[in-house]
């Protein structure tokens, strides 16, 4: 059961669709949304600036000062976006569970070893909602990959457009692997609420056979999920020789 959703907030314009996606997911399971702003100080954000190590000293100083100001601006934006979100959607702010089965929210900010702290929060959550990285938000270039591979938790990537319904149709890309099994298990609460579930697989070396695919579909039936299955053939690369 998904009851806690981590929502990293950048303080930039990407927050809008990330927050909307998190709210839509939260409403499907009355979850608590923990909004986390990772405040990257200049020393941490500087590596995101291309070739900064080759810049002359005075230029680097000005760049670091600019990064500091941008960081403060994003921090203020993250706080503001959170407060506006809770006010507009009437989401109760609280740090501990209440009696009512409703969406609640909390906010925190980390600046000391930000990526380490972000991963720690991610591992202690049931689900993470992330936005696509933009250069202006100071987030690491491989944030999504890092959280996916090192948190051990499922992630949802918010779309660029405002989502209307996050659980209408869910496509499951399946491969016979430990990672796929773990991801499917973590996603079961969402699959159980979806109106349509599609199992997608490709026949290749190490991929599921038809019998394995059918067995997976039967397993989902035990959870009340009547999934459609699409098992295709991977086209051969390259032309005839």
Model region roles, listed by residue range:
Residues 1-64, 150, 164-235:
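Small/aliphatic-rich secondary-structure junction motif
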Residues 4, 42, 49-52, 69-128, ...:
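Structural beta-alpha unit
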Residues 14-15, 19-24, 28, 107, ...:
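Gly/Ser-rich helix-loop-strand patches that form or flank binding pockets
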Residues 18, 111-114, 140-141, 180-183, ...:
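Amphipathic coiled-coil/heptad-repeat helices and related helical stalk/stem segments
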Residues 31, 87, 153:
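A short helix->loop->beta-strand "cap" motif at the edges of active sites that frequently abuts
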Residues 73, 77, 142, 182, ...:
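Conserved active-site and cofactor/substrate-binding residues in soluble primary-metabolism enzymes
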């Amino acid at each position: 059961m998904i009851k806690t959703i981590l929502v990293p907030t950048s303080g930039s314009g990407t927050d809008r669709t990330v927050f909307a996606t998190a709210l839509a997911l939260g409403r499907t399971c009355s979850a608590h949304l923990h909004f986390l702003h990772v405040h990257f100080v200049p020393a941490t954000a500087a590596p995101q600036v291309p070739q900064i190590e080759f810049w002359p000293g005075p230029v680097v100083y000005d760049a670091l000062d600019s990064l500091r100001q941008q960081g403060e601006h994003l921090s203020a934006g993250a706080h503001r976006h959170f407060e506006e979100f809770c006010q507009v959607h009437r989401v109760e702010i609280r740090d501990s569970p209440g009696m009512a089965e409703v969406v609640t929210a909390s906010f925190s900010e980390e600046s000391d070893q930000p990526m380490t702290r972000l991963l720690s929060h991610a591992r202690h959550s049931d689900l993470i909602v992330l936005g696509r990285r933009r250069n202006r938000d100071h987030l690491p270039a491989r944030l999504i990959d890092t959280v996916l591979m090192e948190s051990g938790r499922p992630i949802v990537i918010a779309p660029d457009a405002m989502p209307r319904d996050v659980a209408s149709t869910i496509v499951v890309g399946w491969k016979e692997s430990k990672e796929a099994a773990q991801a499917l298990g973590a996603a079961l609460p969402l699959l159980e609420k979806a109106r349509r579930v599609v199992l997608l697989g490709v026949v290749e070396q190490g991929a599921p056979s038809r019998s394995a695919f059918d067995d997976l579909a039967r397993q989902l039936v035990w959870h009340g999920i009547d999934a459609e299955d699409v098992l295709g053939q991977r086209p051969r690369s390259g032309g005839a020789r």
